Structures are given as C-alpha cells and as structure tokens.
Amino acid sequence: MKALKVITTLLLLTSATATHAQKGMKMDLWPNGATYNSTDKEDKAEMTVYLPDAKKATGRAVVCCPGGGYTHLAMDHEGHQWATFFNNQGIALIVVKYRMPHGNPMIPVSDAEQAIKTVRRNAVEWHIDRTKVGIMGFSAGGHLASTIATHSTGDAAPNFQILFYPVITMDPSFTHKGSHDNLLGTDHSKKEMKRLESDYSNDLQVNRTTPRAFIALSDDDKAVPAANGFSYYEQLYKHDVPASIHIYPSGGHGWGYRESFAYHYQMIFEMKGWLESF
C-alpha cells in the first residue's frame, strides 16, 4: 500500500500534460545591451519564465542553466521540460538561454547573473521571495551554476543550488576537456592558464557562505567524471555547507528530465524531499 502511494505521488509530480503545462514568458536578458559582447552576433541571451499559479506560489524560484559543453544548449530535457514539475511545487522556473563563451568565461557568467538579478527585480510581480532564488545546472550548465554559487555576490548570488552531473573542475586531470577549452580558450600562456583553471575550479572556491546544494549524477558517467561531483560535495562538507549527493549506479550522462532514465522517479522524489527540507 505504501509503495502504491509513493508511485501515485511520483506520477502526479511528474505529469507534464499540455493541459497543465504553464505557458512560458520569453524575455531578452539584455534589452539595453550586454555587459560582455560575444564574437557571435547571432547568439542572443534570453530567459523563459514559467510561473506557478499565484495561489500555489511558495515564493521560490529556480534559475535553470541547461548543459551542452559550452558549445550549445540542451534546452528541452535540461530546461523547459522541468517547468511543470517545479510549478506543481509552487516554484517558478526560469530557463536561461545563455551565450557561449568562445574563451571568455564572463559571457555566460554575466548572463546567468543577469537572470538572477532580473528575477529579483520582478519579485513582487511574480510572487517571488528575493531570499528564495536558487540556481540549477546540468553538465557544463552545472559548471556555470556552481560558478555563480561560489563566485557571485549581492543580488546575483543564489540562495541554493541544484546540480546534475556537473562539470566542477577545470583541472586537466579530471575536467571535461570540451567544456574546459570552450570556456577558457586555448591560447593562454601556461601561467595564465593555470590561474584560469584554478579560478574556475569551483571545488576550490567553496567557503562557509556557499549556498546549500543538491547534487545528482550517475556512477557510470563517461563524459564528465563523477569525481567532479564528489570533489564538490567533499568541499561543501568540509566547509559545513548543507549538501545532499545522490549517485545512481547507471544512467551515464545527460539524462535530465528524460523518463527513460532508470532512476527518474527516484531522483524526482529525492529532490522534492530535499526542497521540502528547508
């Protein structure tokens, strides 16, 4: 009976029918021009806002950074498809179409920070509590999310973080090489590259003010070594930052919201429990 209740709850949580899906509101992230210009003039930063019913709103919001190795974005299963789940919990979801770095990390970083600031600027209208704005990221988007969580301050700093199979380090021994090269570029001196690798190895940037974290990954991930997530969790633990890590025995990389992931419902249930824990 208990198992049946759990299964029923999970099905209700993850139902994403067109009837209940909230229509997103697309916004230009930089209507007055971006702080950092991209070499790709066609690459425009945008965000899509999915708001829960006002009667259901908890005041929470999650700013979502899809993955794609800093070359493209998996906007659906690592972005828009999460809207119904979060809205059903009374949480706003903001999916960010951030620009690619082409060797300049501040391009995606500034886009993600701008998204968080925009959410806080619209907090009253959108029924959001400015102190309950989190960031979520997948793969390279997990690197971007953890960069914001460990580097950003003031109105750009998130209150919690959710990371799926994240790239965390830029250490060549266990980073994701594509993300490393696309983010940092490849034409630096050895000394400058070492500095950049250290600055953007987010496990090295954790301190006691880093926001609480939920981390989920598969043990058999061949694209981004699971050691990335382990290393980040270890540093959060050492600095007394509340964190929850969930390691699934299989699934590889890039499952996002796909129900074909064998542990999809378990992952959803565990994340819901974590969100309810604070």
Where do the language-model regions lie?
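N-terminal cap/lid segment of alpha/beta-hydrolase-fold proteins
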Residues: 22-56
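Mobile cap/lid helix-loop segments that gate and shape the active-site cleft of serine hydrolases
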Residues: 32, 170-205
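Primarily recognizes the serine-hydrolase "nucleophile elbow" in alpha/beta-hydrolase
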Residues: 114-179, 197
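Conserved alpha/beta-hydrolase "acid-adjacent" motif
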Residues: 222-228
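Short beta-strand/loop motif that positions the catalytic acidic residue
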Residues: 209, 214-217, 221
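C-terminal catalytic histidine-bearing segment of alpha/beta-hydrolase fold enzymes
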Residues: 48-50, 230-278
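Catalytic nucleophile-loop/oxyanion-hole region of alpha/beta-hydrolase
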Residues: 74-76, 80-83, 94-130, 258-266
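Short beta-strand element of the alpha/beta-hydrolase
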Residues: 58-67
